[in-house]
A protein has these predicted regions:
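N-terminal, active-site-proximal structural segment of metallo-dependent hydrolase catalytic domains
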Residues: 1-49, 63-66, 153, 262
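Structured beta-strand-rich core segments of catalytic domains in phosphoester-bond hydrolases
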Residues: 35-110
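Active-site beta-strand termini and strand-to-loop segments that position acidic
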Residues: 71, 93-97, 227-228, 250, ...
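Surface-exposed cleft-lining segments at the edges of enzyme active sites
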Residues: 106-127, 162-167
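Surface polyanion/phosphate-binding segment centered on an Asp-His-Pro turn
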Residues: 238-262
Length: 262
């Protein structure tokens, strides 16, 4: 089964590219973040025309939003409001006996200080709640977390570890906390399973960088994690970097995983 995750940065603006990636990669499941669209105008018909019958989404005007676009039926589905804020950052679906969570973690603003930046406080609180939520789950469960987690946790997940230590998305407070979330849930990092350290791996390049490919000042903000029962069934992980160079791109690129779900 092919699973693709992508922060599309606006489903309406990026729909031609979503259609293109579907035609190129033919994913069975497509998980989108930052859809920026209200549920009442979600493009259901357009996805049905592309062969995706099963949809679950939560969205709001201009901000946030997550979606699952599927060729295969799912059982349970739902969401959680994190940190008691209804801002459409999470959904889950159950495929066979595996639960897949789609997250869009808050970016955190510009100043990495919870005392002066409410957006950074929201991010840290969100992650701590994720950690507590995962801690008591059984380690032998079948579970995947994917999406835009808005943190590059390892030194080789950014173009310059030294220069980004005080930049939101790579501060020690964030990176330590995200790794705590990973470990509290007994997850494996599927991208690093296939692209081991010290290989530099990025999934995001700023719009401010005109020659993004040459300068390659990227960060790995997008992730796919799986519990052990699932991680050993993964046959391929591919970061679709060329999508960053398409016309009117997202600043994130899609990530594709091929996996046998149980």
């Amino acid at each position: 089964m092919k699973i693709l995750t992508w922060n599309c940065n606006g489903i309406r603006a990026r729909f031609p590219l979503i259609k293109k990636i579907i035609e190129l990669e033919k994913p069975d499941l497509l998980f989108l973040q930052e859809t920026k669209i209200e549920d009442k105008i979600f493009p259901e018909k357009e996805f049905h025309n592309l062969g995706y019958e099963f949809l679950f989404y939560r969205g709001e005007k201009s901000y946030n939003g997550v979606a699952c676009i599927s060729k295969v039926p799912f059982g349970d589905c739902g969401y959680k409001n994190w940190h008691d804020i209804e801002d459409c950052r999470h959904i889950f679906v159950k495929i066979k006996n595996t639960t897949i969570h789609n997250f869009y973690v808050p970016a955190g603003g510009d100043i990495p200080d919870t005392t002066v930046n409410s957006k950074f406080l929201h991010k840290i609180s969100f992650l701590r709640e994720m950690e507590n939520w995962l801690r008591d789950k059984p380690s032998n469960r079948n579970e995947i977390i994917l999406g835009d987690l808005n943190i590059a946790p390892l030194p080789d997940d950014v173009w310059s570890h030294k220069q980004l230590l005080n930049v939101v998305s790579h501060t020690p407070q964030e990176t330590d906390l995200l790794l705590d979330v990973l470990h509290s849930g007994s997850f494996e990092d599927l991208i690093r399973q296939f692209f081991p350290i010290p290989e530099k791996v990025f999934s995001w390049w700023s719009y401010r960088s005109k020659d993004w490919r040459h300068s390659d000042r990227g960060r790995r903000l997008d992730h796919i994690w799986a519990t052990n029962s699932i991680s050993k069934r993964v046959s391929k992980v591919n970061i679709l970097k060329d999508a960053r160079g398409w016309d009117k791109p997202s600043d994130h690129v899609p990530i594709l995983v091929e996996i046998e779900l149980v």
